[in-house]
Amino acid sequence: MKEGIHPDYREVLFIDVSNDFKFVTRSTIQTRETAEFEGKTYPLAKIEVSSESHPFYTGQQKIMDTAGRVEKFRNKFGSRATGKAVAK
């Protein structure tokens, strides 16, 4: 492999901010924050959804924050988005 062209593949601490679940895995993500976990310092990546909080994996329904995205879409496109497609 050529030197200097590949991203740094290292252990990173991921924290699910919705339930404070933490896990370490290898990643190339770039982050400025670090955190201590099990006596070792890792680069820190904060995520909103993980397997510990996603409804598919937990079997429980939780309200996900998607309403903001829908409202943003409606504000941007207005009534054009609700019109029916014309068949050719």
UniProtKB/Swiss-Prot annotation:
Keyword Oxidoreductase tagged: no
InterPro entries given in the database record: Ribosomal_bL28/bL31-like_sf, Ribosomal_bL31, Ribosomal_bL31_B, Ribosomal_bL31_sf
Alphabetical UniProt keywords: Ribonucleoprotein, Ribosomal protein
Protein name per Swiss-Prot or TrEMBL: Large ribosomal subunit protein bL31B
Disulfide bonds: none
Biological-process GO terms, alphabetical: translation
Pfam families: Ribosomal_L31
Stored NCBIfam families: L31, PRK01678.1
GO CC terms in record: ribonucleoprotein complex; ribosome
GO molecular function: structural constituent of ribosome
Complexes and interactors: Part of the 50S ribosomal subunit.
Family: Belongs to the bacterial ribosomal protein bL31 family. Type B subfamily.
Signal peptide residue numbers: none
